[in-house]
């Protein structure tokens, strides 16, 4: 119980006070003793309340007294009065008075004195003894009081110490209490902080996951954005082409079946639908185009008239030279033409290349034999020579010698088309139309609608004779010429040995002129004349002819067709553009290789040029291919010139030569060769092959990526048989334009198709027909689509048909891809050699380097006709080349040709089959980063865990590219996350490239999957392979089984996890497990 503190004022002024601790035992006397001075007596304690004062008796208990006041205690003040209390002093006075009275009688006090109490009785007198006694008593009292004072002081000191102790204990208790409260508060705060920290950590983890997801999505969005942009560009281009077709500017370019495919993602489906609708509309325009073709035929007649006038002018200017040309052209094909190489043999003519190059006459001479027909046939070349035409570049002047044989069917038309179209600028619509009309009128085939594959003439076989074509055809040739005229770059055809021409009068024979035109088209690309005077100087209004090029009969069967000058670069579906080398078919045993590589120019590669409408053949990108056109020596053309002029060079092919090679669209990138029109040139000599090899030696090769199957090159240069990078444009959606002009169809329609295929196989124009035409087994008609996308194009057969060689002739139209290109036979550099045809002995023998003029092999000393005999074994399809679908799939997946992948995959027996290095199409698509192809292959059910020779799976490839998106796609398709390589035993997560962009995300994802496998999804994983238990503590399982992981590792095993399958438990190897089950191969149908 806490003692109460009583404040006592020692004086009236209330300035001097003391505090007295009050306990229940404290009396008023104790308070007075505590407060009065030592030795002081007669003091009492008085309480004052509201001005009234009352003395407190000594025996009064102060504690109880204070409690009685209760709340009013603060109003009461206690004073120490230094006098006795009135009650006690009255009692003492009474006693003293009695004593004084008694003393008065005894002692007489001299003066008035007061007693100590102040009750003096002056009359009392004390004796000495009394005084002494009093003094003694007082002394004793003083001593007693002093003793009491000392005792009180001691007690007071003790009480103060006790009070201090109590206060200290109280303060300490209070402090302890406060500390306890503070500790509790801090503990509560700590708990809250810990809870908040847990929330913060969780939010950090969530934020990290979200940021990773956001990064992945942003990467996906960027990819999709790029895909959409590319799709938009493609759609714009296609829509522009469609608009041009509607306006009539582009003849014969239109995708067939409305299928324009490309590396499109799901977002592009809508765009594809729109394109399909437009293609359908284009098909509906076929009838209109046919009418337009009739008009074009009329215009061709006008062109023929113009050609006549031009020929008359030329006769005046070069009368003697023209006569010589006529004589040479008709007399012997071998004699070099002193005059311009314009002379084309109308009849099938097999030309034996002369050893020497023919010098070009100073002025290009236009052979009279060509007359209007030849001029029409060379519409472009002739015009180039004409004063009206802008001078050709010398290089471009060279004309590809073409077969004079009756195979003009394609070559003539195609040549003219190519000449016109190949020009760097697309031919004017009228020009295209003219050629197209010619093709229609001559070929009798229904005019193809631009954009719609045009049916080839019923028989595209060799054009048997130079028999005059209908005047319409001549005019169409002239029209082509007119079309070509606009192209300033067109060079006069290089001098060719005149093929034996049927006597040609100045008056053009419509048929012959067309044939000549077809055969003699001036390749726009300059070719260096092998030997002899330079090509016509551009300085002349008329470009001089390039050095004479021996005109070899172009074998229609497989020989590549020279591109008609009219043809501009063909447009190929962007998706179908992939680099391909031209593979030459083996020449027939009988075949006499033409001495001159003039035809070689027919195949051209086009690089970097924008894809032109199918109506125009794309210039060949490879300059080196063009050189052969001259005197058979391969001489590189400048790519630019070649691109523009190659068509013309090809164009000059002799009408007899039935196959012209269209220039292919140039490849997407200089490092990738665009598909070369595959024209296995028939009857190709070893010398021609050697020249081609030399040209290809410096040619850009497709980049060797992991998937490419490349044949080793021998010392002689690339193995042309194996380089045959078959144009698969048709399958890939690429367009090969058919020649505008088709000579009247002959019985051998298949042969013409083959020629077209061969000649036009160079859809990309990679080879300028560097290879002399080699005899090749005719490709199946389907395989050999008419190369020209123009009148001669046929609707494309189904992809299966395209790929499979057919033994029976089909008047069947060669397959055309959506762009009206006939589907070329798919081939890739990966294919060692055409499956269907074994290389002939000549091909197998390393060809000797070509001299400027190649002498025909002795064996082929006798002239051979290019015309195919109806019953010839070569006529059958059995020997046609068929390309390995797997090689095509491997290359298409590497190059990003989504359309080709979609089409060819059904031809592949096992899309997961690897090449000799263990590379599968999925490896290629992953390494090249083609997400849409990867997704397609995975959805198709290819083996996502196929490993190459070093154990690299597609997941390793994706990780090495730091592609999180592909890694996620592969993991979700059943990729084995713990699969390791053989050489360095590293998983995909170890293959992430630390110095490359995207390393952190890719590494985090793969390591995260490794850590979460067997933990997330309640420990459920999926077996990716079948496994039979080898020990009693192991589990057997089958692919696709859902296994629950109970323990990822223990003291005994780290690579084996303890798992449960059904009611069994045991060890399972972790590298056979995946986070997702593998996608099952889907049913193989073409649906």
Curated annotation (Swiss-Prot):
Ranges annotated as biased composition (Pro residues): 445-458, 523-536
Q: Where are the ANK repeats?
A: 917-949, 950-982
**Residue ranges under compositional bias (Low complexity)?**
459-476, 610-625
Kindly give the Gene3D superfamilies that the UniProt entry links to this protein: Ankyrin repeat-containing domain, Phosphatidylinositol 3-kinase Catalytic Subunit, Chain A, domain 1
- Per its record, what are the GO molecular function terms? p53 binding
Query: In the record, which positions carry Phosphoserine?
Result: 332, 335, 679, 708
Where is this protein localized, as stated in its record?
Cytoplasm; Nucleus
Q: Name one GO biological process term.
A: negative regulation of cell cycle
Which portions of the sequence form the region Disordered? 82-122, 374-415, 442-721, 734-878
Taxonomic superkingdom: Eukaryota
Subunit structure, interactors included: Interacts with P53/TP53; the interaction promotes pro-apoptotic activity.
**Free-text comment about domains:** The ankyrin repeats and the SH3 domain are required for a specific interactions with TP53.
Identification of the protein by name:
Apoptosis-stimulating of p53 protein 1
């Amino acid at each position: 119980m806490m003692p109460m503190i009583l404040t006592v004022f020692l004086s009236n002024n209330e300035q001097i006070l003391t505090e007295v601790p009050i306990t229940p035992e404290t009396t008023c006397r104790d308070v007075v003793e505590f407060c009065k001075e030592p030795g002081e007596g007669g003091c009492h304690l008085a309480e004052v309340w509201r001005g009234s004062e009352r003395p407190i008796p000594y025996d009064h208990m102060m504690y109880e007294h204070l409690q009685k006041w209760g709340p009013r205690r603060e109003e009461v003040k206690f004073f120490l009065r230094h006098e006795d209390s009135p009650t006690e002093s009255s009692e003492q006075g009474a006693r003293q008075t009695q004593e004084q009275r008694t003393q008065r009688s005894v002692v007489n006090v001299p003066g008035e004195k007061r007693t100590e109490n102040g009750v003096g009785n002056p009359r009392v007198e004390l004796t000495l003894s009394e005084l002494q006694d009093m003094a003694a008593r007082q002394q004793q009292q003083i001593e007693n009081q002093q003793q009491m004072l000392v005792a009180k002081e001691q007690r007071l000191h003790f009480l103060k110490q006790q009070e201090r102790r109590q206060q200290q204990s109280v303060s300490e208790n209070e402090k302890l209490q406060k500390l306890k409260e503070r500790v509790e508060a801090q503990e509560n705060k700590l708990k809250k902080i810990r809870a908040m920290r847990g929330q913060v950590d969780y939010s950090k983890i969530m934020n990290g996951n979200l940021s990773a997801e956001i990064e992945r999505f942003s990467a996906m969005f960027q990819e999709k954005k790029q895909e959409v942009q590319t799709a938009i560009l493609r759609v714009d281009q296609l829509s522009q082409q469609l608009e041009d077709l509607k306006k009539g500017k582009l003849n014969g370019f239109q995708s067939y079946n409305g299928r324009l495919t490309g590396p499109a993602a799901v977002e592009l489906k809508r765009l594809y639908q729109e394109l399909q609708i437009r293609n359908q509309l284009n098909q509906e325009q076929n009838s209109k185009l046919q009418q337009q073709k009739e008009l074009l035929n009329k215009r061709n007649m006008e062109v023929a008239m113009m050609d006549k006038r031009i020929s008359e002018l030329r006769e005046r200017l070069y009368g003697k030279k023209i006569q010589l040309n006529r004589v040479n052209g008709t007399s012997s094909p071998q004699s070099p033409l002193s005059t311009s190489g314009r002379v084309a043999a109308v009849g099938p003519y097999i030309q034996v290349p002369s050893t020497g190059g023919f010098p070009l006459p100073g002025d290009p001479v236009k052979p009279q034999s060509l007359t209007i027909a030849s001029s029409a046939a060379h519409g472009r070349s002739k015009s180039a020579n004409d004063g009206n035409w802008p001078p050709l570049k010398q290089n471009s002047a060279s004309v590809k010698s073409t077969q004079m044989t009756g195979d003009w069917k394609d070559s003539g038309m195609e040549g003219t088309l190519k000449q016109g179209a190949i020009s760097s600028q697309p031919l004017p619509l009228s020009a295209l139309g003219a050629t197209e009309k010619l093709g229609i009128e001559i070929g009798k085939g229904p005019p193809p609608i631009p954009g719609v594959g045009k049916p080839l003439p019923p028989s595209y076989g060799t054009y048997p004779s130079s028999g005059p074509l209908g005047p319409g055809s001549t005019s169409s040739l002239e029209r082509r010429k007119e079309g070509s005229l606009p192209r300033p770059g067109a060079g006069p055809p290089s001098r060719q040995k005149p093929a034996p021409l049927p006597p040609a009068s100045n008056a053009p024979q419509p048929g012959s002129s067309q044939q000549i035109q077809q055969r003699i088209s001036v390749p726009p690309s300059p070719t260096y004349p092998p030997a002899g005077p330079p090509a016509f100087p551009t300085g002349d209004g008329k470009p001089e002819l390039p050095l004479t090029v021996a005109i070899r009969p172009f074998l229609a069967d497989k020989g590549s067709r020279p591109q008609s000058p009219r043809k501009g670069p063909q447009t190929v579906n962007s998706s179908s553009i992939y680099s391909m080398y031209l593979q030459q078919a083996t020449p027939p045993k009988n075949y006499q290789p033409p001495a001159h590589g003039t035809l070689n120019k027919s195949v051209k590669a086009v690089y970097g040029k924008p894809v032109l409408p199918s109506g125009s053949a794309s210039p060949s990108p490879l300059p080196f291919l063009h050189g052969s056109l001259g005197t058979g020596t391969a001489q590189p053309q400048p790519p630019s010139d070649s691109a523009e002029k190659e068509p013309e060079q090809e164009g000059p092919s002799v009408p007899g030569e039935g196959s012209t090679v269209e220039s292919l669209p140039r490849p997407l990138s200089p490092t990738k060769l665009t598909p070369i029109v595959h024209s296995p040139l028939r009857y190709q000599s070893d010398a021609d092959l050697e020249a081609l090899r030399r040209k290809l030696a410096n040619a850009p090769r497709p980049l060797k990526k992991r998937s490419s199957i490349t044949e080793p090159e021998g010392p002689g240069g690339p193995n042309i048989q194996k380089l045959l990078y078959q144009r698969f444009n048709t399958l890939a959606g690429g367009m090969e334009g058919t020649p505008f002009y088709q000579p009247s169809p002959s019985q051998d329609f298949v042969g013409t198709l083959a020629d077209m295929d061969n000649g036009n196989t160079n859809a990309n124009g990679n080879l300028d027909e560097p290879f002399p035409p080699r005899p090749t087994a005719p490709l199946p008609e389907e395989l050999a689509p008419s190369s020209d996308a123009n009148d001669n194009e046929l609707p494309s057969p189904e992809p299966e048909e395209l790929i499979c060689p057919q033994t029976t002739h089909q008047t069947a139209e060669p397959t055309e891809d959506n762009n009206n290109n006939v589907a070329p036979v798919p081939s890739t550099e990966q294919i060692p050699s055409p499956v269907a045809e074994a290389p002939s002995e000549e091909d197998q023998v390393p060809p000797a380097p070509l001299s400027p003029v190649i002498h025909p092999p002795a064996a082929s000393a006798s002239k051979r006709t290019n015309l195919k005999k109806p019953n010839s074994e070569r006529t059958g399809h059995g020997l046609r080349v068929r390309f390995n679908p797997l090689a095509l799939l491997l290359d298409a997946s590497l190059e990003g040709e989504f359309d080709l992948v979609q089409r060819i995959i059904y031809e592949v027996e096992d899309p997961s089959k690897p090449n000799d290095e263990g590379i599968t199409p999925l490896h290629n698509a992953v390494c090249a980063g083609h997400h849409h192809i990867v997704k397609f292959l995975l959805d198709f059910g290819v083996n996502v865990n196929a490993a190459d020779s070093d154990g690299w799976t597609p997941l390793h490839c994706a990780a090495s590219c730091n592609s999180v998106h592909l890694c996620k796609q592969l993991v979700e398709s059943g990729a084995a996350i713990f699969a390791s390589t053989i050489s360095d035993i590293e998983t995909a997560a170890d293959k992430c490239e630390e110095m490359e962009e995207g390393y952190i995300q890719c590494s985090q994802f793969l390591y995260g999957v490794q850590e979460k496998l067997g933990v997330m999804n309640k420990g459920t994983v999926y077996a990716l392979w079948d496994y039979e238990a080898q020990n009693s503590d192991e589990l057997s399982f089958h692919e696709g089984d859902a296994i629950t992981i109970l323990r990822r590792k223990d003291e005994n095993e780290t690579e084996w996890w303890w798992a449960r399958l059904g009611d069994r438990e045991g060890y399972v190897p972790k590298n056979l497990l995946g986070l997702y089950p593998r996608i099952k191969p889907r049913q193989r149908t073409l649906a």
